[in-house]
Curated annotation (Swiss-Prot):
Database matches in InterPro entries: HotDog_dom_sf, MaoC-like_dom, UPF0336/Enoyl-CoA_hydratase
Single GO cellular component term: mitochondrion
Keyword line: Fatty acid metabolism, Lipid metabolism, Lyase, Mitochondrion, Transit peptide
Subcellular location(s) of the protein: Mitochondrion
Pathway: Lipid metabolism; fatty acid biosynthesis
Natural source organism: Solanum lycopersicum
Gene (name only): FERN
Superkingdom of origin: Eukaryota
Job of this protein: 3-hydroxyl-[acyl-carrier-protein] (3-hydroxyl-ACP) dehydratase required for mitochondrial fatty acid synthesis (mtFAS). Essential for photorespiration, tomato morphogenesis and plant development, probably by influencing mitochondrial membrane lipid composition and other lipid metabolic pathways, and by contributing to energy supply and reactive oxygen species (ROS) homeostasis.
Pfam families noted in UniProt: MaoC_dehydratas
Official protein name in the record: 3-hydroxyacyl-[acyl-carrier-protein] dehydratase FERN, mitochondrial
Residue ranges annotated for the MaoC-like domain, each copy included: 36-124
C-alpha cells in the first residue's frame, strides 16, 4: 500500500481542550492551508475546470484581479476535509457558501468549522456548523453553513493520510 499526504502544506488543529474530545455547541475545528500552483492544476484536471482566471494572469488582471485565482470550490473543500479528519464516516449533508474575496496562489487560508447545533437521531448526530475561511492577515474570504451526519460526537485526532493501492 502506498501512503500519501493529502495536503503537504496543511495543519489541522482544534480549540477543544485535551480533557474533552466530544463535539459540543461552540466547539471549533480549524485547518491552515496554503494553496500552490500544483493544487490548482490538480483541481482543474480532476474537475475539468479550465477557467482562464485560474491559469492566465493577464486574463485575471483584465477581470480586475491582481493575479490568478484559486478556485473557490477548492478553498471550500477544506470544510468537509476538517469534518472527515475528525469524524471518520461522517456524511456531508449540505453546505451553503458565500464567496467574499478572492484567494490567490500562496495565500495562507485558515478554515474554521464551529458547531452551532447538534441533535441526536437514533445512533447518529446531525450537526449544524458555521463555516468560514479567512486569510492569515485577517479578511474573510468564504463563509457559510454546513450540515453533517456524524457517527459519534467523539473528535478523533485528525487523519491526514489516505491509503491507495
Amino acid at each position: 500500500m502506498l501512503m500519501k499526504r493529502l495536503f503537504s502544506s496543511s495543519h489541522v488543529f482544534s480549540s477543544s481542550s485535551a480533557s474533552s474530545n466530544l463535539l459540543k455547541i461552540g466547539s471549533v475545528l480549524k485547518q491552515a492551508r496554503t494553496f500552490a500552483d500544483d493544487d490548482v492544476l490538480g483541481y482543474s484536471k480532476l474537475t475539468h475546470d479550465a477557467n482562464p482566471l485560474h491559469f492566465d494572469a493577464e486574463c485575471a488582471k483584465n477581470a480586475g484581479f491582481t493575479d490568478c485565482l484559486v478556485p473557490g470550490m477548492l478553498v471550500a473543500s477544506l470544510f468537509p476535509r476538517i469534518i472527515a479528519a475528525h469524524f471518520p464516516g461522517a456524511i456531508y449533508v449540505s453546505q451553503t457558501l458565500h464567496f467574499k474575496l478572492p484567494v490567490y496562489i500562496g495565500d495562507e487560508i485558515i478554515a474554521e468549522v464551529q458547531a452551532v447545533s447538534i441533535r441526536q437521531i437514533k445512533n447518529k448526530y446531525i450537526a449544524k456548523l458555521s463555516t468560514k475561511c479567512i486569510k492569515r492577515d485577517g479578511p474573510l474570504v468564504i463563509d457559510g453553513e454546513a450540515t453533517a451526519m456524524l457517527p459519534s460526537l467523539v473528535m478523533e485526532p485528525p487523519n491526514l493520510e489516505i491509503t491507495s493501492s
